[in-house]
């Protein structure tokens, strides 16, 4: 009976072991999915139906570098965009703004075109001297200045983020096949693929969020691991702003910092990001995007070829870049430095001396209007003695100090001196106070610039805050730059972060929620002022106030610390008491966060290696079961059969015989 029971138990254990071997891997893998995607996405492969996949939190990354099928595009420079509209950190108190004599004019006062359109210093000097002569006649032009409202439309498009992935299949010792992701790296796709993606996406209609796997999973082979590679594409639905330039070309600007992409192409590629849009969405027929900003009289300078509009603070080259025809503005000229204007008429204006002589020869009853006009011109030219002296002085200063980078208000308008190839050249600029900081703040650390936007034209530009002017074609070149790394190092040491403006320094102190202002006391920064009150002052229509700058840069600095520095900091040997007190509330949650993160990473590692773990566990279980069910009973039976028989001793006592073993006899004795 005992043998039958043992045989039944043995057969049952063998049957259970066989079932475990056959179905064990499949059961475990059903709870350990290798493929996942962000929530809301769907799977698509060429020739395959849409398939829902489980949700995972992050895009899988790996140090494994797969075979490179296409050349990797160079990195695209990007500005840091940290502050959001809802991430507002309060300024600790109004006293943090600094002393009461903080200059209020902390905004760019001028805009300058491409610095390649410059005049040699001697040529500028000749023009300056000519403007001071009361005996010289001038060619006067009636000019209307125009601006372009470049925003045409806001359309819906798609942003694609491309990764090149590598997967491999592995078959375990008991036949279970698993597929694992071993490589996922950002990579740009060739235009041939992008064109096909664009056609497919636009034909499918309104795709909100999607993910495409553009390669097949590797097949399973018991004797070798099989690899498969291809593109994984994430698709996001976004809004795109379509702009128009002065000659009517549609384009998209700043998809990445400083980018300019033609609308007619239908897509743009920067790094591993692709933007796609429908080119049939925007029509510009009979629409007007020009707006007249000024109507004034300007002087033409034969020496430099510049048109000088003193009353509006604009100087520009008379050389034409192109002419355009607008349905609402008519014929317009575009100068080589980008000013849009139209000449309404020209006339020769006699010199002040000639006009005075003419009036003296005529009847004294000419009228008060002419007399007032004459008196105004006489007083205007009283400054000619100062004017010529200032031309001489400026030429000497700029010749000996060619590194000057301040826009100067000269007798012929605002000019910027710059140095190129060892020579000082002059660039005409415009008084343009309509620039404001764009929010959320975009700060470029490599060049210490802030992105600003013109309230009239909505044009965006980068402002190098150490200067009083904007260079309209300046671009940002931030991409993990040394400058940004130095800022992070200073934050790790709890040191001040300084933003140097052209009128002083804004200092943001740890824990980066308060600031103070230091005005330049040595007066090395020259104030761009007007010569006489007769010249119109700058019209600060939309000033960037110090409060505005302070709040935005404090928010920006604090965000960088919270995102890039604080999460990666461990314990330090010396920690200020203010830091301990200020962050004691976050210590507990931070500890829990790291514990949860550690548990999650451990669980993620287990799920990634579940097939190997299951194989090992199955082998261990089989060995244990084999030992308990098969080997142990056999050993037991074998060992029992080998037990030695004890000799029997026969003892007789009073006629009775008893059988004793040797041990019993020994005990009896």
Curated annotation (Swiss-Prot):
Glycosylated by host. Glycosylation is crucial for glycoprotein export at the cell surface. Belongs to the nucleorhabdovirus glycoprotein family. It comes from Rice yellow stunt virus (RYSV). Residues 1-24 form the signal peptide. The gene is G. It is found in: Virion membrane. Attaches the virus to host cellular receptor, inducing endocytosis of the virion. In the endosome, the acidic pH induces conformational changes in the glycoprotein trimer, which trigger fusion between virus and cell membrane. The chain crosses the membrane at residues 610-630. This is Glycoprotein. Homotrimer. Interacts with matrix protein. The keyword Glycoprotein applies. Residues 25-609 are virion surface. Residues 631-669 are intravirion. It comes from the Viruses.
């Amino acid at each position: 009976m005992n043998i039958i029971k043992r045989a039944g138990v043995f057969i049952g254990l063998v049957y259970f072991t066989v079932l475990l071997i056959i179905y064990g891997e499949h059961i475990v893998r059903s709870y350990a999915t290798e493929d996942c995607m962000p929530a809301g996405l769907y799977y698509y492969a060429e020739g395959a139906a849409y398939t829902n996949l489980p949700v995972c939190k992050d895009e899988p990354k790996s140090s494994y570098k797969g075979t490179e099928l296409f050349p990797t595009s160079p990195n695209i420079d990007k500005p840091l965009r940290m502050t959001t509209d809802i991430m507002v950190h309060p300024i600790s108190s109004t006293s943090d703004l600094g002393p009461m004599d903080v200059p209020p004019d902390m905004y760019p006062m001028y805009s300058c075109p491409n610095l390649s359109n410059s005049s040699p210093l001697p040529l500028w000097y000749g023009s300056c001297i000519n403007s001071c002569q009361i005996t010289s006649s001038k060619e006067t032009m009636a000019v209307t200045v125009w601006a372009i409202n470049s925003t045409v439309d806001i359309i819906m498009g798609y942003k694609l983020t491309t990764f090149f992935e590598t997967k491999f299949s592995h078959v375990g010792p008991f036949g279970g096949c698993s597929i694992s992701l071993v490589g996922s790296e950002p990579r740009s796709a060739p235009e041939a693929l992008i064109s096909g993606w664009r056609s497919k996406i636009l034909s499918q209609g309104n795709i909100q969020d999607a993910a495409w796997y553009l390669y097949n999973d590797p097949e399973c082979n018991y004797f070798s691991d099989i690899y498969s590679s291809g593109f994984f594409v994430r698709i996001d639905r976004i809004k795109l702003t379509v702009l128009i330039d002065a000659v009517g070309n549609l384009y998209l600007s700043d998809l990445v910092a400083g980018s300019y992409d033609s609308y007619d192409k239908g897509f743009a590629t920067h790094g591993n990001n692709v933007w796609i849009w429908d080119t049939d969405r925007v029509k510009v027929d009979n629409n007007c995007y020009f707006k007249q900003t000024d109507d004034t009289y300007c002087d033409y300078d034969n020496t430099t070829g510049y048109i000088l509009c003193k009353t509006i603070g604009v100087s520009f080259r008379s050389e034409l870049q192109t002419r355009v025809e607008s349905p609402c503005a008519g014929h317009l000229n575009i100068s080589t430095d980008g000013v849009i204007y139209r000449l309404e008429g020209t006339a020769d204006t006699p010199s002040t001396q000639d006009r005075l002589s003419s009036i003296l020869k005529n009847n004294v009853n000419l009228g008060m209007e002419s007399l007032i006009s004459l008196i105004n011109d006489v007083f205007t030219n009283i400054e000619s003695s100062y004017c010529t002296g200032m031309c001489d002085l400026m030429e000497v200063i700029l010749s000996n100090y060619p590194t000057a980078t301040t826009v100067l208000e000269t007798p012929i308008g605002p000019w910027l001196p710059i140095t190129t190839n060892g020579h000082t050249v002059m660039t005409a600029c415009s008084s343009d106070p309509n620039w404001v900081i764009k929010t959320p703040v975009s700060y470029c650390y490599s060049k210490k610039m802030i992105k600003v936007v013109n309230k009239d034209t909505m044009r965006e530009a980068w402002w190098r805050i150490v200067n009083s002017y904007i260079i309209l074609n300046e671009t940002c070149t931030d991409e993990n730059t040394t400058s940004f790394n130095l800022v992070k190092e200073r934050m790790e040491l709890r040191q001040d972060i300084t933003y140097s403006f052209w009128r002083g320094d804004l200092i943001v102190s740890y824990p980066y929620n308060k600031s103070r202002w230091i005005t330049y006391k040595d007066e090395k920064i020259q104030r761009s002022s007007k010569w006489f009150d007769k010249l119109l002052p700058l019209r600060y229509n939309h000033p960037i106030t110090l409060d505005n700058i302070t709040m935005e840069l404090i928010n920006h600095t604090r965000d960088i610390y919270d995102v890039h520095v604080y999460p990666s900091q461990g314990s330090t040997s010396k920690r200020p008491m203010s830091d301990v007190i200020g962050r004691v509330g976050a210590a507990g949650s931070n500890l829990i966060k790291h514990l949860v993160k550690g548990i999650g990473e451990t669980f993620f590692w287990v799920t990634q290696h579940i097939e190997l773990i299951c194989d090992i566990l199955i082998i261990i279980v089989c060995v244990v079961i084999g030992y308990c069910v098969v080997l142990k009973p056999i050993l037991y039976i074998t060992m029992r059969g080998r037990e030695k028989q004890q000799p029997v001793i026969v003892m007789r006592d009073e006629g009775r015989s008893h059988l004793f073993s040797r041990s019993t006899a020994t005990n009896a004795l």
